[in-house]
Structures are given as structure tokens and as C-alpha cells.
């Protein structure tokens, strides 16, 4: 699985397709926040902005009125798993889990370096077992192991989206689409993850306006990395691919980036010049 964000941008740049990507992160946080507020998730509207899983909930509305102040007040007196309270207190917004990892990335790397087993290794083994289970023609239910591996049920996001396109039920959700002026700080051709309205006529991105100032730099770096990645693919260019990694805020060493790129190109038989 690749990230839908760069695929939306690449397919839009390289083809004439109209592309929409779906990520399940916003639905997870909608349910969590609804539980904190004691509200029905369907009543909430999220002012969400993100790139990949690096997302922020800037506001939460119910019936057109902001409930953000109430949410922040409730969070002061309770401990919710999966929320980064340091970032909430500092920026007065709700970050996603991966956003928390970015702002604590040195700690995350240190923890991974000393762990006995990577999470990916456990997931890989579980996937192999699940695939063997699905070879059984008599299997008529989802294996419990699938639930244990913390699966995301994309059907809960994708089916309503398809129904919205077919005109069965207009939908407001969060999706990966081309920016087209929604975020003023980014180019129209950038793919972004923002609120959209979906109906039989298609998908319409909501206006986001300007990014919070503290987000501008990292978002610009990520989108430049995406642009360089797509251009590297188009030109089959090693230098552009390395540039894409060098400006990516998650990459801390061009030396390691070069070694990784050389190894990946060799293993995957990618012809870069």
C-alpha cells in the first residue's frame, strides 16, 4: 500500500484522470472526539487539514457552532489514549498520532532502535497467517486475527463516498484531492487532505484559507518533496529522487538517503540515471 496523497497528485499530473484518495484517520478521530463530547459522530464537522497522516483538527463544530473550546476544556481533566497533550496544550488544536511522532521523532527513533521487534515484523507475520486463512474456501467470516492486528475498516469510509458519487446520499467528509486554491499557501496542483462535499456532480473541496503559521514550513517541504518525487519518476532521475528525500522533513541525513535510494533502486530494479 502506498500513500494515496502522492498518488492523487501523480495521477492528476501524469494522466487526465480525476482522482480522489481516502484515508481513515479523520474518521477515527471523529469517533474519539464524539465520545469525549458525548455526541453522535454524524453530528460533528471537523475542520481538518493534513498531508499524509500529518494532520491537525483545527476546529470541531456541531450544528454549525464551534465546540473546540469545550473539547479542550474536557481534555484538561481526562487522559485520552492516542492524543498528544503536549502539542494540544502548545497549539490548541488536536494533532493526529503521526503528527505527534513527527514532533517527537528523535524519541520515536530511539525507542525503535532499542525495541526487540519492529511493529512491521509482527504485522507481516499476521498478514501471512491471514492470507493462509483466506485460502480456505469454507471461510465465511472475518478472521479474529484480522481484528487483532488493528485493521482499519476502509469500507466504512469508501462505501459512503461511492454512494455520494452515485447520488444516493450527499456526503461531507475528509478526502485527498487537488488543492485548487483551498489552502492559499500551497499550489493548486498540490494534493492535500481536507474537508470535501461529495454528490452526483463530483467532489468539491472546502475553502481552508491560510495555514497556521507554524505549519507552513513543514507543509511546503513535504509538498516540494512530493513534486520532486513525481518529477524524478517522470525523468527517471537519481538526482531528483535524492533531492526529494533530502528536502523531506522526515529524512535527517542525505548520506543515509543516498544509501537507501541506491539499495531500493537495486532491489526493485528501478532504472535511474
Task: Give short role names for the model-derived ranges.
Residues 34-273:
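Long, compositionally biased stretches enriched for glycine and/or charged residues
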Residues 12-19, 64:
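A glycine- and small-aliphatic-rich helix-loop capping segment at beta-alpha/alpha-beta transitions
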Residues 8-13, 31-34, 58-60:
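Short acidic, glycine/serine/threonine-rich loops at helix termini
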Residues 5-6, 19:
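Tubulin/FtsZ superfamily GTPase core signature
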Residues 16-33, 37:
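Acidic, His- and aromatic-enriched active-site or binding-groove loops in soluble protein domains
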